[in-house]
C-alpha cells in the first residue's frame, strides 16, 4: 500500500515537472539530465525491488557523453 502511494506521488511529481518543463521549452542540458534521471528512478521504483539488486547499467557511450558534458554543466552552474 505504501509503495503504491510512493509510486503515485512520484508520478504526480514527474507530471508536474514535465508540465513546467514543456512550458519553458528551452531546457538546459543539466535540466534534461535531471528529468531523465528522475524518470529512471520512477521506473525502478515501479518495477519493484528486483530492479535495485542489479543496479543501473550505462553503456560506455553514455558514460563518455556524461563525462564530456561535465565541464559544460559546471560552466553553466558558475554563471548563475
Swiss-Prot record:
Its main location: secreted. GO terms for biological process: chemical synaptic transmission; response to light stimulus. GO terms for cellular component: extracellular region; synapse. One of its GO terms (molecular function) is hormone activity. Eyestalk. The pigment-dispersing hormone causes the migration of the distal retinal pigment into the proximal end of the pigment chromatophore cells and thus decreases the amount of light entering the retinulas. May also function as a neurotransmitter and/or neuromodulator. This is Pigment-dispersing hormone type 2. The function of PDH precursor-related peptide is unknown. The sequence is not well-conserved among different species and that might be an indication that it is inactive. It is found in: Secreted. Residues 1-23 form the signal peptide. It comes from Penaeus vannamei (Whiteleg shrimp). It comes from the Eukaryota. The modification Alanine amide is found at residue 77. Belongs to the arthropod PDH family. Pfam families: Pigment_DH (PF06324). Keywords: Amidation, Cleavage on pair of basic residues, Hormone, Neurotransmitter, Secreted, Signal. InterPro entries: Pigment_DH.
